[in-house]
Amino acid sequence: MRNEQEHETALKLRLADIPVQVTSRYGMLEKICLPYVDGRGDAEPLFAVRASDADLDFERAMAPEFSNPYLESCAVHRALAERFASHERIVFHSCMVEYAGRAYAFAAPSGTGKSTHARLWMQHLGDAGAKVLNGDKPFLHVPQEGAAVAYGCPWTGKEGWGYNGSAPLAGICVLHQAPTCSIERLDPAGAVELIMRQCYVPRENPAGTLAVLGCVDRLLTRVPVWSMGCDISEDAVRTSFEALTGTEYAGCSCNK
């Protein structure tokens, strides 16, 4: 039998540079959130989140095979996404790779290969050169003025890739499988539907929906979006690297 004993713990976190309070009812949520405990300690949380029994039931209706600890994690993530929209933050389903101080998002439907492509970057560019900021659901801050910023968060996907950090978002690459590698830059009109598919949009919250649309509109004017067909060869790394970074790919820098 799975251990689902409740023990509530209130955690003051800093997520996407916003102080929030998250109450954990089960140990799983507390464990994944610990790296994000607010070390400054002087900022009052802007809001508090706790998953109710009704929230767990909502998640269970979509995924009945999972335990309460896992469902709580999903419910709290959903609640944060709902609240973050009004603070110019969105959840962007992607694998976010940091390289040379900038973040690059690889987006695709689940199972298409975004994690595989990120792994290729780490393999061919070296662990010290490319690392995953968040492997599944990074937060993006898209302010009214200035650069969009990608943030790590506790929800890191099945690979568990990620860390508490941030970097300016310098490019988005939407992947699809293909026998040969090719890439093209999309204009905002051509990219908007692809980008919206990767964003969490608040449920039954018109103001939150409008806030997400505003973030996406600003994102598309500031961050280049690429559509790439790729395989799993080193040529895939070369193709995306040169387009996204604007620099020549010099070959594998990993330790032989």
Task: Name each model feature, range by range.
Residues 2-34, 66, 86, 93-95, ...:
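Glycine-rich, often acidic-flanked micro-motifs
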